[in-house]
Design a protein with these regions (language model features):
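Alpha-helical cap/lid subdomain in secreted, periplasmic
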Residues: 1-157
């Protein structure tokens, strides 16, 4: 993972890295401690290269939900790493769970038949919400512009 992170990300010198991380650890039943160490090391390397970073937690999907204990551990460790390294975590799992549980959208409306990956609608909503959150944080930090506290409440697709 670290070799690929170096060549596919860090060597390209991006301004912002959006790192979807943790789903494979959940599905493969990897050790949470080792996963935390790898993520923390990856975040440190990205920051040392001068890039900003946003972590994205696992998706709410049937295959991830089958391993709910592991998913919960991964989301907690991502939160701890984010707090330690002072980076944001986009709560994709909670957003998607909200679509299904609170908004009563069937999982099949945003997840493809493999039970894991999002479809075009799911990715479009995810991209819109993530973009809104990035704009919100940039505005608050750099411009001092007031943005509603939860962009997800006014930007449904």
């Amino acid at each position: 993972m670290m070799k690929r992170l170096q060549s596919a990300v860090i060597d390209r010198k991006p301004d912002l890295v959006i790192w979807q991380v943790g789903t494979n650890a959940v599905l493969r039943g990897l050790d949470p401690g080792e996963t935390a160490r790898l993520v923390q090391d990856g975040v440190a390397r990205i920051q040392s290269a001068g890039s900003d970073i946003v972590l994205v937690d696992p998706q709410y999907s049937p295959r991830v939900n089958e391993k709910s204990e592991g998913a919960g551990k991964v989301m907690k460790l991502l939160g701890r790493v984010a707090e330690l390294r002072k980076v944001g975590v986009f709560p994709r799992f909670e957003v998607m769970r909200d679509w299904h549980e609170r908004q009563a959208i069937p999982v099949e409306e945003f997840i493809i038949a493999d039970g894991l990956h999002m479809n075009d609608w799911g990715y479009a909503c995810f991209a819109q919400l993530l973009g809104d959150d990035i704009i919100k944080s940039v505005c608050q930090i750099k411009l001092g512009v007031a943005v509603p506290s939860d962009v997800r409440t006014y930007r449904p697709m």
